Amino acid sequence: MRVPALLLAATALLAAACAPADQAQPTPSGPAVAGAGDCAKDRLRTREPGRITFATDQPAYAPWFEGDDPTNGRGFEAAVAYAVAEKLGYQRGEVGWTRVPFGAAIQPGPKQFDADLNQFSVTEERQRAVDFSSPYYDVRQAVIAPKDSPVASARSVSDLARLRLGAQVGTTSYQAIKDQIRPNAQPSVYNTNEEAKLALGNGQIQALVVDLPTALFITSSELRDTVIVGQLPPSGDRPERFGMVLDKGSPLTRCVSSAVDALRADGTLSTLERQWLADAAKAPELT
């Protein structure tokens, strides 16, 4: 969710990944998956031969992207993208970025990118429109409220049902409100998390639901008079997971997934999670 400005126009900003190597934290590197076969770099059918183009939204927020600059490789999703590129055999200067709004990226139709990282939860509905890579992060949803409000003392999901709640449209955060909290009043929906945060600050809603790492950033850096009430319990038998979005039927899906799987196996994903998302484990649990 983005987590997660007014509804952004689908304006694509291409930016070559040319940041100096010392701008990003080093990441563990195992054997590349690009040695032979269909996943060899020179056989990958990327939009631009010899380069791979990733996408994310604008603005792009911490802890997923630091400084609204994916090319610096800082932030969890930025670091994952560069680690995937390395596994596929791409040098840092062979990685490009473009900006695509969240909603546009998961709509059916040709994409202006090879893979998009923007806190996309893998759902059956979305899989009918786009491809997803193997998941790179298991996520929970969290509830934010003003520190001085009675909501801040809520300890159970049932305590939230009477509240005016809000979330970004089309997100699993909104779906969590509908499916898990089941509020008495229809939840408010917003085009972006920026609009949702403004509504919380203005008192139009009493609590906001976003993914947990985004909630940590909002409460610590943006809306300092708010607090994480708690994280919602896992929904269903399978955890909610983030995956990269690719064009439906993309020839790259299998190779990108193989790269993600290799990063999980060699410990890189765990290392990056500890580096960028360590505080997520400390949030209180709602029962």
Residue ranges and their predicted role:
Residues 14-17:
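C-terminal motif of bacterial Sec signal peptides marking the signal peptidase cleavage site
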Residues 59, 73-88, 120-122, 139-197, ...:
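Bilobed "Venus flytrap"/periplasmic-binding protein-like clamshell domains
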Residues 84, 108-110, 160, 200-201, ...:
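Hydrophobic residues within well-ordered alpha-helices
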Residues 26-118, 128:
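Extracytoplasmic small-molecule ligand-binding "clamshell" domains
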Residues 93-159:
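Acidic, polar ligand-binding/catalytic clefts
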Residues 19, 30-34, 78, 82-87, ...:
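Extended ligand-binding regions for polar small-molecule ligands
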Residues 104, 120-129, 178-179, 201, ...:
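A ligand-binding cleft/hinge motif common to bilobed small-molecule-binding domains
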Residues 58, 138-145, 220-261, 279-287:
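Periplasmic-binding protein-like
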